[in-house]
A protein has these predicted regions:
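N-terminal loops that bind phosphate or other acidic moieties
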Residues: 1-130, 134-360
Length: 360
């Protein structure tokens, strides 16, 4: 049997590569003669650069010092041989860096610094993953690093974060760095607009520490920025990453499904085409998964042949012939604190399921 293990990362506990390795180890304990192929995935969030680096060993990693909440921090981008640069917001301006207690001041400045580094090195195309954002600044920090001027009534640059947008009276993009010749693709797993009840502040603000009373203020600040631009704030994906989707569209980027685009770049359709079984997964399988996350993408590529492993499962899994929740398998404490061993057990459980008459 040929088995492809193609999971996303388990956010905060295990990288996609680690998940794939652990599941494969468990599977081999039960079915040692099977051929196992590791194909870790990402959907534009945490682990996007790492996922490409594992799948594309011909890439060159470039570390970049970025502005963090408590001083300099280190992010990175990956240079591919064709001139493409893979960039992720998560390590440059994400929750992992900023935490969830600065909803009004967290900035996308670091993302701009990483993009600028890639452009300085001669990148001819950008793939920008925008998941795991900490900010709701409408991408203003990123735009400023790339040469945009967002000014207040005195003609000065506005302050950082969503709070700074309250003072914005003009947006000047005339001095922005040009989009590279091969274009900019935003890798995104959501289709939310910038504003309103389904927008960046209302839907994602609480994940970044915003209180209920903060949401109308944050939405109003984003609305002020949107009024200064030319991109329709209702554009699907404009609300991604606290409005960074809108800012990248303003620059000239296009938005695409993160998992699907990354899968195509990494050759996932061809890899799974000849597999007997595919195992995919993510930290939490819930109602958002069908909106473009890795498990839904893989299941659509190989219907009836895709098994699921997740930290927790809170949605219908009828599309998968077998599914394992780490919380159900080993308990919540072990699932969170001993994730790799739990994944090994999950891999073994799925292998046993594959040996049952209705699946073998």
């Amino acid at each position: 049997m040929r088995v492809v293990v193609a999971p996303d990362s388990f956010k905060g506990t295990a990288s996609a590569d680690s998940v794939a390795s652990a599941v494969a180890e468990g599977w081999r304990r039960e079915r040692p003669d099977d051929e196992i192929v590791s194909a870790p995935l990402a959907d534009g969030g945490e682990g996007t650069v790492e996922g490409f680096a594992v799948a594309r060993p011909d890439g060159i990693r470039h570390d970049v010092e970025v502005e963090g909440p408590e001083g300099p921090a280190t992010s990175a981008w990956l240079e591919l041989p064709d001139g493409t640069a893979v960039v992720e917001l998560a390590s440059a301006a994400g929750i992992e860096l900023w935490g969830t207690n600065q909803p009004f001041t967290a900035s996308t400045h670091g993302l701009g610094e990483v993009i600028a580094s890639a452009l300085d090195a001669g990148a001819t195309r950008l793939l920008v993953g925008v998941g795991s954002s900490a900010s709701t600044d409408g991408g203003a920090g990123m735009l400023a690093v790339l040469g945009a001027r967002i000014i207040d009534a005195d003609g000065d640059a506005i302050g950082p974060g969503n709070a700074g947008l309250a003072d914005a009276v003009a947006l000047d993009l005339s001095s922005m760095r040009p989009v590279p010749a091969g274009g900019v693709v935003v890798l995104c797993d959501v289709s939310n607009p910038l504003l309103g009840p389904f927008g960046a502040a209302a839907v994602f603000g609480p994940q970044k520490g915003a209180e209920p009373d903060d949401i109308p203020v944050m939405n109003g600040n984003l609305s002020r920025l949107a009024a200064l631009g030319t991109v329709d704030p209702a554009t699907p994906g404009a609300g991604a990453a606290g409005g960074t989707g809108w800012a990248l569209l303003q620059w000239g980027a296009e938005i695409r499904s993160g998992a699907e685009s990354i899968g195509a770049e990494l050759g996932i359709p061809a890899i799974v085409a000849t597999a007997d079984v595919i195992i995919t997964g993510e930290g939490r399988f819930d109602g958002q998964t069908a909106a473009g996350k890795a498990p839904a993408y893989v299941a659509a590529l190989a219907p009836g042949r895709t098994m699921l492993v997740a930290g927790s499962i809170d949605a219908d899994v009828s599309a998968f012939p077998a599914a394992v929740s780490l919380v159900d398998l080993v308990g919540r404490d072990r699932a969170l604190n001993d994730t790799i061993d739990a994944l090994i057990e999950a891999g073994a459980a799925l292998a046993r399921r594959a040996s049952e008459p209705d699946l073998s």
